[in-house]
């Protein structure tokens, strides 16, 4: 079959003809789209060629310049530089030389300025001089302290400063300024403050002359013991309280009544309101709302805390509800 001879047309029906036209239109659109993508796609460059392309001079629009145009531009720049009579911006040595002279000039100006402050009649003290004459290392403990803090003793911002209370009632600072700062209020004449001997033990002795009372408190961890003798409120009465949160104290006949018992001497007056009662029963099956129940003290919650109801050789006592005046000692003894 000769391809150059005219070929007799093939017969197709209407449906086949419509399908052939649709296929030709779709193929033409696809070829046109692929042709546009291939023209806009960036060509692949090897790494070395890419670096070379990045070093090549570009003109307006990012297009590479030809060698002829590049030589013309360089000749034009050289002529402009010769006409100006100066060096171009590419002269790195001249720039570095100019930069090297700047620190010396600045340091000399700073030196003269600081000396002028030291010699002039300024409001600042004359002992302040520049850092080149008397260099002093900056310590982290004193970095946050202003010059006013070195003389006042009240504004203390250093984390290493610790305060200690001496015998005269003043706070002596260790690790910071050696000045002493007195407490906010005067120390009463009837109160003696003992120095602290242990980090976990603190003793406080106070005597109240107004009520004739004597109080001693010592703290060891969670245990605190309070001994109080009041001649004004209860003449001849003697109370001792112990708070031990780590153990359960037992009353008479091994009954569980933790942290509560009463000591008293034989010279109890009628004002103390001690009422003999039956031995204490276990607190587990007692009616708390019934004040006449065996072993329950008739006391408000504020008066039960400083009492100790263990170890007495007599019957347990119920102390009537009674308001106890303060003993005049500073601090809470619990």
Swiss-Prot record:
The keyword Transcription regulation applies. InterPro entries: CCAAT-binding_factor_CS, NFYA. A motif (Subunit association domain (SAD)) lies at residues 11-35. The keyword Nucleus applies. GO terms for cellular component: CCAAT-binding factor complex; heterochromatin; nucleus. Residues 42-67 bind DNA. Keywords: Activator, DNA-binding, Nucleus, Transcription, Transcription regulation. Residues 46-65, 75-239 are annotated as: Disordered. Belongs to the NFYA/HAP2 subunit family. Signal peptide: none annotated. Gene3D superfamilies: 6.10.250.2430. Pfam families: CBFB_NFYA (PF02045). PANTHER family: TRANSCRIPTION FACTOR NF-Y ALPHA-RELATED (PTHR12632). It is found in: Nucleus. This is Transcriptional activator hap2. The lineage of its organism: Eukaryota, Fungi, Dikarya, Ascomycota, Taphrinomycotina.
């Amino acid at each position: 079959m000769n391809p150059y001879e005219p070929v007799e047309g093939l017969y197709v029906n209407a449906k086949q003809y419509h399908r052939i036209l649709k296929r030709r239109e779709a193929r033409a659109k696809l070829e046109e789209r692929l042709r546009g993508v291939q023209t806009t796609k960036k060509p692949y460059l090897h790494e070395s060629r890419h670096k070379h392309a990045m070093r090549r001079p570009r003109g307006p629009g990012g297009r590479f310049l030809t060698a002829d145009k590049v030589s013309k531009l360089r000749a034009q720049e050289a002529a402009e530089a010769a006409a100006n009579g100066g060096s171009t911006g590419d002269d790195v040595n001249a720039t570095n030389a100019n930069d090297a002279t700047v620190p010396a000039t600045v340091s000399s100006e700073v030196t003269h300025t600081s000396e002028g402050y030291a010699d002039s009649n300024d409001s600042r003290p004359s002992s302040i001089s520049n850092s080149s004459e008397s260099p002093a290392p900056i310590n982290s403990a004193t970095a946050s302290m202003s010059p006013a803090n070195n003389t006042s003793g009240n504004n203390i911002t250093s984390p290493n400063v610790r305060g200690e209370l001496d015998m005269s009632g003043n706070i002596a600072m260790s690790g910071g300024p050696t000045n002493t700062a007195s407490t906010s209020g005067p120390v009463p004449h009837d109160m003696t403050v003992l120095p602290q001997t242990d980090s976990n033990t603190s003793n406080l002795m106070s005597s109240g002359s107004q009520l004739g009372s004597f109080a001693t408190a010592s703290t060891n961890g969670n245990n605190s013991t309070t001994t109080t003798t009041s001649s004004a409120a209860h003449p001849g009465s003697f109370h001792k309280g112990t708070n031990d949160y780590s153990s359960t104290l037992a009353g008479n006949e091994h009954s569980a009544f933790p942290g509560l018992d009463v000591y008293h001497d034989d010279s109890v007056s009628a004002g103390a309101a001690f009422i003999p009662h039956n031995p204490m029963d276990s607190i587990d099956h007692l009616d708390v709302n019934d004040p006449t129940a065996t072993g329950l003290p008739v006391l408000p919650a504020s008066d039960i805390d400083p009492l100790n109801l263990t170890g007495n050789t007599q019957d347990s006592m119920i102390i009537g509800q009674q308001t106890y005046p303060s003993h005049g000692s500073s601090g809470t003894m619990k």
